[in-house]
From Swiss-Prot:
This is Phosphoglucosamine mutase. The keyword Isomerase applies. SUPFAM superfamilies: Phosphoglucomutase, C-terminal domain, Phosphoglucomutase, first 3 domains. CDD domains: GlmM. It catalyses: alpha-D-glucosamine 1-phosphate = D-glucosamine 6-phosphate. One of its GO terms (cellular component) is cytosol. It comes from Leuconostoc citreum (strain KM20). Belongs to the phosphohexose mutase family.
Length: 455
């Protein structure tokens, strides 16, 4: 199958506005179809088991109930993990030897959105081929899946022990505790809200928290990895060594140094990658990144005898490259960092522990560790368009991109790509000065708006 066009699945599962485009009816059908596809190779002498987690969105309970009903209706038992992070679900699928896992989350998106992420029994996100199979069943004019009765039905039960197993795993990924470390923690009012104080207390760190009081509506609202400004203020006022901001489902991390400056995914990958390389643990001395990583990141790697392989945007593509070529560190500027030695997906809490471990082992401040990455000014503009793919291929837009790249003469770059989850075209540029990057982005964005007939 050369190119798979998916109707429901985007780059990170099924997303939509809860109860509008992502309805409980759709969640129920996804439970039936996804459950049937993912458990078809389960042992025949016992019922398949699927684990289900969610973030703190008010719609999470509604969608979880519907999804679970779908699983139960095809004879699958369900373990409810409750509010938990996405990487915890990926870990627990393997740890509990479940047949599949599901997380109800829209990650860093606003509270009105929600989504459904599937994991196979190996803890990895699904391939395009598997998602296509699920979609074919979803759109089938007739539901031919089994409808067992009586003891053939699945049974759902709570499994609060999952969080404890996950935290125990995390603590074993560093060979020391965090005594003597002072940090500020921002849980984005999301899935890490309850885990953060428990985990860092267990590791003997001194910490202050924010964004750990979810009410179902305040997830990612002015807090978390997409809004680290408030955390930066807390870091400075509390005089701690670092700030750690997570997103709504806990699969990404953005850090803040002791001065309140942002340490993004590029810098985190560089810091941890350099440390791993010096210890002989960075496979092939290579970090896998996406096309969104900054030029300064690549220059810092090269200066310290490391290289990088680029992929399309999305941690699933980073992971695919890591598996294919045997790399063990990769991620995105946005803070999805994958430590393949321990995990099958990006994990904000795991990343936080690795970063703090480097700080503790080296005795260096976070600002000192990040200083090697001299970031080129970068600007990203999101433009709402009706057809993001068509506009990306528009001749006038392509001509303007070529014109800008010629003017850059190699000292800068342009990236124009459609969003994987929203009806947006993203226009990004990097250049030596802020003035130049503003000029380049606005030149391209103006043509995009003109061709898309948007103001």
């Amino acid at each position: 199958m050369s190119e798979i066009k998916l109707k429901y699945f985007g780059t990170d599962g099924v997303r939509g506005i809860a109860n509008e485009t992502l309805t409980p009816e759709l969640a129920f059908r996804l439970g039936r179809t996804g459950g049937a596809i993912l458990t078809r190779h389960a042992e025949s002498d016992k019922k398949p088991v699927v684990i289900v987690g969610r973030d703190t969105r008010i719609s999470g309970d509604m969608l979880q109930q519907a999804m679970i009903a779908g699983f139960l209706s095809v004879g699958i038992d369900v373990l409810r993990l409750g509010v938990i992070t996405t990487p915890a679900v990926a870990f627990l699928v393997q740890n509990l030897e479940a047949d599949a896992g599901v997380q109800i989350t829209a990650s860093h998106n606003p509270a009105a959105d929600n989504g459904i992420k599937f994991f196979g029994k190996d803890g990895f996100k699904l391939s395009d081929e598997l998602e296509y199979e699920i979609e074919q069943l979803l759109d089938s004019p007739e539901d031919t899946l089994p409808r067992p009765s009586a003891n053939g039905l699945g049974v759902a039960s709570n499994y609060p022990e999952g969080a404890l197993k996950y935290m125990s795993f995390l603590q074993k990924t560093i060979p020391t505790d965090l005594s003597g470390m002072q940090v500020a923690l921002d849980g984005a009012n999301g899935a890490t809200s309850d885990l953060l104080p428990r985990l860092f207390a267990d590791l003997n760190a001194d910490f202050v928290t924010m964004g750990t009081e979810p009410n179902g509506l305040n997830i990612n609202d002015g807090v978390g990895s997409t809004h680290p400004e408030a955390l930066a203020d807390l870091v400075k006022s509390s005089e701690v060594q670092a700030g750690l901001a997570f997103d709504g489902d806990g699969d990404r991390l953005i850090a803040v140094d002791e001065n309140g400056d942002i340490v993004d995914g590029d810098k985190i990958m560089y810091i941890t990658g350099k440390f791993m390389n010096e210890q002989g643990r960075l496979k092939h001395s290579t970090v896998v990144s996406t096309v969104m990583s900054n030029i300064g990141f690549y220059k810092a790697l090269a200066a310290h005898d490391m290289t990088s392989v680029k992929t399309a945007v999305g941690d699933r593509y980073v992971m695919a490259e890591m598996i294919k070529s045997g790399y063990n560190l990769g991620g995105e500027q946005s803070g999805h960092i994958i430590f393949r030695d321990w995990a099958t997906t990006g994990d904000g809490l795991l990343t936080a522990l690795q970063l703090l471990y480097v700080m503790k082992e080296t005795g260096q401040k976070l600002s000192e560790l990040a200083a090697d990455v001299q970031v080129y000014p970068q600007k990203l503009v999101n433009i709402a368009v009706a057809d993001k793919v068509a506009i990306q291929k528009n001749p006038a837009v392509l001509a303007k991109i070529a014109e800008v790249e010629a003017e850059m003469a190699g000292d800068g770059r342009v990236l124009v790509r459609p969003s994987g989850t929203e009806s947006l075209l993203r226009v990004m540029a990097e250049a030596p000065t802020t003035e130049l990057v503003e000029k380049y982005v606005e030149a391209i964005a103006a043509v995009v708006r003109d061709q898309a007939n948007v103001s």
